[in-house]
Amino acid sequence: MSILQKLENSAAAAVKALYGTDPMEGQIQLQKTKREFKGHLTLVVFPFVKMSRKSPEATATEIGEWLLANESAVSAIEVVKGFLNLTIAPRVWLELLNEIRADINFGHKVATEDSPLVMVEYSSPNTNKPLHLGHVRNNLLGYSLSEIMKANGYRVVKTNIVNDRGIHICKSMLAWQKWGDGVTPEKAGKKGDHLIGDFYVLFDKHYKAELNSLMAEGKSKEEAEAASTLMAEAREMLRLWEAGDEKVVDLWRTMNQWVYDGFEATYKMMGVDFDKIYYESETYLVGKEEVLRGLEEGLFVKHSDGSVWADLTKDGLDEKLLLRADGTSVYMTQDIGTAKMRFNDYPINRMIYVVGNEQNYHFQVLSILLDRLGFEFGKGLVHFSYGMVELPEGKMKSREGTVVDADDLMDEMIRTAAEIAAEAGKAAEKDEEESREVARIVGLGSLKYFILKVDPRKNMTFNPKESIDFNGNTGSFVQYTYARIRSLMRRAEAAGYDIPSQLPTDLPLSEKEEALIQKVSEYAEVVSEAGRSYSPALIANYIYDLVKEYNQFYHDFSVLKEEDERIRAFRLALSEVVALTMRKGFALLGIEMPERM
């Protein structure tokens, strides 16, 4: 039982003993005491004033005196208006530290075969371009959320839906046919996803030139788009693909495999993975079947041009296209099919889609359509909506070829980390292989932390220069502190200093040492809240606060030079627990920790 739970129970007992009634649910409000006051935890007394029929100050004093007499964990009280500040006895903090040290899974719940199953979908790339900065935020959020849900005792299936078909894919294919001259990734000397992305940009370049030419002849933009022969060829290629044309399908398979190979290398570098990958080319037909079933059952309507729509006006929305006039499907068709396949494949208790907030409407509609089609899981979908990410220069647009590729960004982060280490003279202390590995860990850690520390629901600007800074709220600052603690522990081991498995509980503690133990003990609740609110940012910022707390302690107190063996062992044990908590928390963010920097 945590100190918080213990004192909540004792506070409830105090209210019952003093006022003859049990407090209602939510009336016991314990919070961390503000720094300007004495104490560790503060009880809000206002809810009990009616029961006591006394002033808030008198009520707080009564409850505080009862706790002093009946709860050994409380060593002192301070009343500030309607707030009761409680000081926890040093013995209790030391007992808690022993409990945390003895529990290797502290803060994490272990799933069993009976635990609820959560599926988390993230990444969802198109096979016409490499992953970019927007995908980086998506992948990092999805992977971290999956790890956080695991730490909350859920079984988790990490899944990806690859958008490997559609008009955007045909644009790259057509451009390669027209202007590719048989080039392959090997011939070009570049990753397949980057090569295909080049052809997507090339298509757009020729398409814009064609539109400009048609508009120069007097056509409006809409008329020019309708008259475009290039776009007509792309649409015909899509029709042939859906009809199973052998040549088109063979080209599609070849070019997609180039992209898959490129994606796999990017995912590996990023440190994310998936338990199950679905492909739109396999799921859209299931979706079409469901749409046609809905049409037969009168759930959907067919317009005069042959297109199929869902009328959502009774749900406060508009009409939604499900099949185009030529019979080809849209994203919604695919998502209906994918959802059906997933719930057939796994006994899912919760389905979480990690998709940007520009798709809020899409998932609102998907939930309604699945429910209308008779799927019970329709109302249980969770859209983990996150904000857009930009660079200081502005938004990214893949059609213009100005997008920041994930590969280039990760390479730049690693290179910058290596340069900073070289300038600081750190590289000379390690061999070349270790220096490269540390640069990789620090560079990628800085990238991940900078993105994940931001509330996922907010738009953000990623500044590469700011992200690698050994001061302030950055991943490299946390990693440096971790490496320093690991160095401390190595030196302690070399000196032969022993740390007993159970620390004595009669040691004197300073306020900063108590505060540090209290901060470590909060890890479990932070992990729990991060799972409830789907927020890796809570983990990131908690770890940063823990690091600041530790650095204050390290600055003010001797560890290795402490002459009292018992106090030295305590401070080493506390340092070790802080490092372990940092590592566990960063693992939930997908960030590695370097043993040396």
Curated annotation (Swiss-Prot):
One of its GO terms (molecular function) is ATP binding. Its EC number is 6.1.1.19. InterPro entries: aa-tRNA-synth_I_CS (IPR001412), Arg-tRNA-ligase (IPR001278), Arg-tRNA-synth_N (IPR005148), Arg-tRNA-synth_N_sf (IPR036695), ArgRS_core (IPR035684), DALR_anticod-bd (IPR008909), Rossmann-like_a/b/a_fold (IPR014729), tRNAsynth_Ia_anticodon-bd (IPR009080). A motif ('HIGH' region) lies at residues 125-135. It is an enzyme of class 6 (ligase). Keywords: Aminoacyl-tRNA synthetase, ATP-binding, Cytoplasm, Ligase, Nucleotide-binding, Protein biosynthesis. The keyword tRNA-binding does not apply. GO terms for cellular component: cytoplasm. Transmembrane segments: none annotated. It comes from the Bacteria. GO terms for biological process: arginyl-tRNA aminoacylation. The keyword Glycosyltransferase does not apply. It is found in: Cytoplasm. Monomer. Belongs to the class-I aminoacyl-tRNA synthetase family. This is Arginine--tRNA ligase. It comes from Porphyromonas gingivalis (strain ATCC 33277 / DSM 20709 / CIP 103683 / JCM 12257 / NCTC 11834 / 2561). The gene is argS.
